[in-house]
Amino acid sequence: METNKEEDVTLSVVMPAYNEGTHITDNLLETSRVLSGFVKRYEIIAVDDGSADNTAECIHRAEMQDTHIRGISYQPNGGKGHAIRTGIAAAEGRYIAFLDSDLELPPILLKRFLKDMKEQNADIVIGSKLHPESKLHYPMLRKIMSYGYYLMLKMMFHLNTHDTQTGIKLFKKEVIKPIVSQMQAEGYAFDIEILAMAAKDGRKICEAPIELNYSRDDSKGGRRIGLKDVAKVFNETVEVKRRMHTHGR
């Protein structure tokens, strides 16, 4: 009898992808291999967010090799938030996570997230770069940008969480499905809208340590955050705040 599996867990992992054709097949198969070590029943939902390369074809290739993987593809590009919302809407698991498809955040982290969710009776567990146990290997500029955004969010939303933007989060299905159905953010402000709405609804949000290895080779595709993205995140965040104020949230 196996003792290292979450016997009663059904986990859905949503992995948004944009121009990730170079490595998405291997990353999906690797994620499935890791999940199989601690989850008995799981699915991986890979969402091709209107890619201009062969991401959709590569996701289909992974589907053909592993029945735990299923793909969703659409045009045009809708933004990371749109991709995650699409994946969550299709998810069937009792627990639903989303994970960046570049695997800079290793999928084994979800084992700790599931454990923390049960032990702390949390509704949401989020990865935090500011957790004292986190191990970070990424550029100083990204560290500065991340901390600056944290300070802005703290002033605007008064959240008790320290890091809203890390690309790995775990939710109870009954918590995230109603929230996502009401959301409007399409881009990078998607995370803050989820957490702000959850906090207003009195949901328990816990933070867990992460290991982040920034190894992106920009010649291999994907999306790099630039100055235009920073401005867009700021504008989207202000819009989230405005909507929540307008609707009394």
PLM region descriptions:
Residues 10-12, 43, 193:
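Cell-envelope/extracellular polymer assembly enzymes that use nucleotide-activated donors
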Residues 1-33:
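N-proximal low-complexity "stem/linker" segments adjacent to membrane-targeting elements
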